[in-house]
Design a protein with these regions (language model features):
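A nucleotide-sugar donor-handling region in carbohydrate enzymes
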Residues: 141-220
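Donor-nucleotide binding loops and adjacent catalytic segments primarily
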Residues: 25, 188, 192-268, 278
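A donor-sugar binding/catalytic signature common to diverse glycosyltransferases
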Residues: 109-114, 258-285
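Short amphipathic alpha-helix
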Residues: 18-29
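Conserved nucleotide-sugar donor-interacting segment of glycosyltransferase catalytic cores
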Residues: 97-156
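Conserved nucleotide-sugar phosphate-binding/catalytic loop shared by glycosyltransferases and other
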Residues: 30, 34-89
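Nucleotide-activated donor-dependent transferases that construct or modify glycoconjugates
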Residues: 2-14
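Short, polar loop motifs at secondary-structure junctions
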Residues: 41-46, 114-116, 167-173, 217, ...
């Protein structure tokens, strides 16, 4: 008997889109273990595996670029436009190739966070396309002016054809989507006992004096770590492998741990903030 198949297409911009979609896919696996999950993204497999505990197919494809950034704060509009233009010049080939993949693998539903081309691909294959996000890329690119006008129009044409939008909290209106349902926050759940993790990481500071520093998959080029020396009675946690060796800075280097796993140890999170980090912190309040 054929397994129901869900194809999840994610913008490969940072880690946030992959994380929140992986959280949804994980819940689908819990509720409907017979569903086959296909994760279509250039995000690394180790990231997906940190949220998806059961087997899935990782298809390394990209249908958009999000925003090209040097780090979590510095955006490169020129490089973004160049890469988007290249993708849309290949649009017909991308749609043909991936819609064939959907048909050949008997995919039942496409869930997109939130590449617009995924809608066109799904409909070419004759299956519905649902989107999930708190913003659309048209919302981001529109303020970047005339150079992006053609791309914005193409994105909005596809978004307007989506069968359903699952609109996350903290959202822009997303009025281009004709059918919307507001949903709750996405995010992972901590997987380790708080006291065990505190001992494992050597955290001795109380929770109200422990801060998680996290800047998503794109990181930050120049985190002023030296400033932490002014707070010797505070403990800071970071996943940055380039972080210096400071007495009050703990580097979490084991990939088994995710930011959400160490949040229960912390009274504060210092971030940019990205949606997934912010959502996971809010879910733990």
């Amino acid at each position: 008997m054929k397994r129901p198949t869900l194809y999840c297409a994610m913008t490969g911009h940072g880690f946030g889109h992959a994380v929140r979609t992986a959280c949804i896919a994980h819940r689908v696996q819990q509720l409907c273990p017979e569903v086959l999950i296909i994760m279509a993204t250039r995000s690394p497999r180790w990231l997906l595996e940190s949220y998806l505990e059961k087997p899935f197919i990782h298809r390394s494809v990209a249908f958009d670029v999000g925003v090209i950034q040097a780090d979590s704060l510095q955006m490169d509009q020129g490089a973004t436009l160049a890469q988007l233009t290249q993708i849309y010049q290949q649009k017909n080939r991308l749609i043909a190739t991936e819609s064939n993949y959907l048909r050949n693998n008997q995919v039942d539903l496409v869930l997109a966070d939130i590449p617009a081309l995924a809608v066109a691909i799904a409909h070419r294959a004759g299956i519905p396309a649902w989107c999930v996000s708190n913003f659309g890329w048209n919302f981001i690119y529109r303020d970047w002016g005339e150079p992006f006008a053609e791309i914005v129009a193409a994105i909005e044409k596809d978004y307007a054809q989506a069968d359903l939008l699952l609109r996350l909290p903290l959202a822009e209106p997303m009025a281009i989507f004709p059918n919307q349902v507001d949903v709750g926050l996405t995010g992972g759940d901590p997987r380790f006992a708080e006291q065990d993790l505190r001992q494992k990481l050597g955290i001795t500071a109380p929770k109200d004096r422990t801060i998680l520093l996290t800047f998503g998959g794109l990181g930050l080029q120049a985190i002023p770590y030296d400033g932490l020396k002014a707070f010797p009675d505070w403990q800071f946690l970071t996943f940055d492998r380039q972080a210096p060796n400071l007495p009050n800075l703990t580097q979490v280097s084991d990939q088994v741990y995710r930011p959400v796993d160490v949040m229960p140890l912390c009274g504060r999170v210092m971030s940019k903030p990205g949606f997934s980090t912010f959502a996971e912190a809010l879910r733990l309040e």
